[in-house]
Amino acid sequence: MAVTITRSGVLSLGADAVVLALEMTGSAAACPAGEELLRTGGEKLAAALNEAKFVAVGHAAELPESGLPAAHLLLTATPRYLTGKANELLILGRCYEAVFSLAEKLCCRSIALPFLSTFYYRFPQSEAVEIARRAAEKTPLEVFLCAETDALCNLARQPYQKPQIVSYFGYYRDYAVFTLSNGLFARVDLRPERVFADVVPYVEACYQRGNDPAQPPLPEAEIARLRRIYEESGL
């Protein structure tokens, strides 16, 4: 279904459902979209939030009697980006999957939400935007992704720039790792029968080149083959 990137507020688009991001503590996230919803919903929304059941990070729930003009208010608890070692990017993707799945179950045809965790949660902006766009493209809903700053809106409207490999990092067991231009890592499967690559926010020290003396170094030709797998992947 259609995906629209806009600078508009989530309530101005007439969507069947809107999304309120929550802190991990359960309180509304202090971001422009959250402030818009709290301001419009007033005391009724504040009271409903106080009575709401806990929503786990990466999950979603509907909040009835919200006092908002939208038919459905959906809640999702979003992750903070700390070190990248807690699967933050994966969990952020699950937040989108959860709210879209719930909206479909509620028979919604459209949904408006901010780019989750991008306002002050320290997420790598390009990756957070791409996670949102990819998730939105998979749902049959009409999705309005509402950027909370001009800079984020401009970034989100640009084609995704695939991070470039900077250097070979090392390998361990079945995977080789390359450092990327955005500070993340490309992980590529060494097994010839599996053509697989993905992007991960961190790697363990065991992948560092030369960490294991019993692990022979990869030939340069093999490193070049693995590099091509990443470059030709759809990441």
What do the predicted segments below correspond to?
Residues Y172-Y175, T179-P213:
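Acidic, low-complexity, intrinsically disordered interaction modules
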Residues A71, C108-S110, P140, R173, ...:
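Secondary-structure boundary/capping motif
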Residues V200-L235:
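Mixed-charge, Lys/Arg-enriched low-complexity segments
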Residues V18, L73, A112, F185-R187:
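Short hydrophobic-acidic sequence motifs that mark active-site Asp/Glu residues
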Residues M1-L106:
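Glycine-/small-residue-enriched capping loops at alpha/beta junctions
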Residues V10-A15, A151-C153, V195:
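A short acidic, often aromatic-flanked loop/helix-cap motif at beta-alpha or helix-coil junctions
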Residues R80-P163:
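Phosphate/ribose-phosphate-bearing ligand recognition and processing surfaces
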